[in-house]
Design a protein with these regions (language model features):
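Positively charged, small/polar-rich N-terminal and surface patches that mediate targeting and assembly
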Residues: 1-124
Length: 124
């Protein structure tokens, strides 16, 4: 479960785009990875010129086909969640290619970096 401070979240989204953004093409991504791979994800974002994001560290959860990430006991690892809004498909597609490439280097499929893409209805 991810708990979000909505006013802070909305501020982060709004400051990423001008108010005239055509939201028809805007996509929201949630990138989820084992916290161990957070530094690699930040390298990928930098390599792709993406310097706008909101990130939550030490998130807890369990993905389909993965072990739990609870931050204690038998499951000491945690998850990192990074949210990015894109108003252009090109950097998003480049990011997806980079994540696919990084995942080929990560030996265990359960540790792969996951990107979830969603339509973003409106930015106010």
């Amino acid at each position: 479960m991810i708990c979000v401070n909505l006013p802070r979240l909305c501020t982060a989204i709004v400051t990423s785009f001008a108010s005239s953004t055509d939201t028809a093409a805007v996509k929201m991504t949630l990138i989820v990875c084992n916290s161990f791979f957070k530094d690699r994800l930040m390298e990928i974002l930098k390599e792709n010129g993406i310097d706008y994001f909101t990130s939550w560290d030490n998130a807890k959860g369990k993905g389909r086909g993965t072990r739990p990430h609870r931050g204690s006991g038998a499951y000491p690892s945690t998850t990192s969640v990074t949210m990015i809004a894109f108003d252009d498909e090109a950097p998003l597609e480049a990011l997806i290619r980079s994540i696919d490439e990084a995942n080929r280097e990560i030996q265990r499929p359960e540790d792969h970096i996951r990107l979830f893409q969603l339509p973003l209805e409106r930015i106010v």
